[in-house]
């Protein structure tokens, strides 16, 4: 549920940014249709890249901690 709310908030920010960047031009279409798909996809790609940069090292560290924990437990049982 929170993911959908965050997604809508991000889209509304993109729409407001694109609306504020078009000054002095009469817009005959709605603001949401003026945002191009390529702009949204490039923003999503940048967001995914940032998330992967953060999550991949975290997953590696957590995996290493779990591996050490598992190894120590196996040594204690032996």
Curated annotation (Swiss-Prot):
Cytoplasmic membrane side: 73-78
Record InterPro entries: Glycophorin
Annotated transmembrane regions: 52-72
GO CC term (a single one): plasma membrane
Bilayer topology: Single-pass type I membrane protein
Subcellular location: Membrane
Keyword terms, alphabetized: Glycoprotein, Membrane, Sialic acid, Signal, Transmembrane, Transmembrane helix
Ranges in the topological domain labelled Extracellular: 20-51
Primary localization class, coarse: membrane
Signal sequence range: 1-19
Post-translational modification: The N-terminal extracellular domain is heavily glycosylated on serine and threonine residues.
Protein family according to the UniProt entry: Belongs to the glycophorin-A family.
Role according to the record: This protein is a minor sialoglycoprotein in erythrocyte membranes.
Protein known as: Glycophorin-E
Organism the protein comes from: Pan troglodytes
Classification of source organism: Eukaryota, Metazoa, Chordata, Craniata, Vertebrata
């Amino acid at each position: 549920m929170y993911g959908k709310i965050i997604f809508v908030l991000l889209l509304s920010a993109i729409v407001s940014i694109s609306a504020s960047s078009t000054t002095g031009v009469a817009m005959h279409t709605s603001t949401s249709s003026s945002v191009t798909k390529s702009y949204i996809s490039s923003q999503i790609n940048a967001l995914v890249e940032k998330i992967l940069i953060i999550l991949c090292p975290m997953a590696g560290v957590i995996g290493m901690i779990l591996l050490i924990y598992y190894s120590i437990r196996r040594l204690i049982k032996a």
